[in-house]
Amino acid sequence: MPNGTLIWHSGSTCNVCFEDDSRNGALLWVDGQTGDHGILASGVRNSFDGVWVDSMGYLFTDNGRDWEGNHPPEEVNLLVPGADYGWPNDEPDDPVPSGTIGPIAKWAPHTSMNGIDVRPENSSLPGLSISTGHTVYASVYGSWNTLLPQGHEIVRIDFTPAFDEAGNFSGWDSDETRIATQLGTPLPLRFSPSGDLYYATFGGGGTLNRFVQI
């Protein structure tokens, strides 16, 4: 975080359950100097990565429960300190239970959206200008319990500000686009200071790759 606070993404111990330790299935804040820590957000089943986006805040991925068909979608969420993001109470007929916060972007269920990073202005890869919105890129590891294989890709997500009828800011609209497919099992993903995008894969002994637009 800009103030130096570390964020620890703590996964759940189960597919669907109420955790005995509330630090599981949550985002934790950590003081890097003292080691003090606490719960920053709950209801987050399995968040792999997050990134700070100026004028938006902290975005983080979250992978929902398995073995429930086309539910729930993989998520990108905007951090609100103290908020509950729904797991394990989210259901197909009630995807955003009362008192919880829904995602600001979604992707195919059970595909494991993992790494995420904000596209810098100096990148040659496509994206919005800072005057119109923000673009992040995310890695999608790939499905393992769907009928047909999905994922194994890099996704571009554009966020643009939304306004109500009175012209007041009301949130963020998102637009998701596949940028590259058949990438194996991508996990971490980062833009370099020069604007190049790098990602690493898990399978096949692991590889580090630079993503280039042709």
Place the predicted regions along the sequence by residue.
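Short coil/turn segments at the loop-to-beta-strand junctions that recur within blades
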Residues: V44-F48, Q182-P186
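Asp-box/WD-like beta-propeller blade repeats and closely related beta-sheet repeat scaffolds
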Residues: M1-P2, H9
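Generic C-terminus detector
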Residues: G184-I214
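Beta-propeller domain segments
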Residues: S12-F18, S22-I39, R45-T177, S194, ...
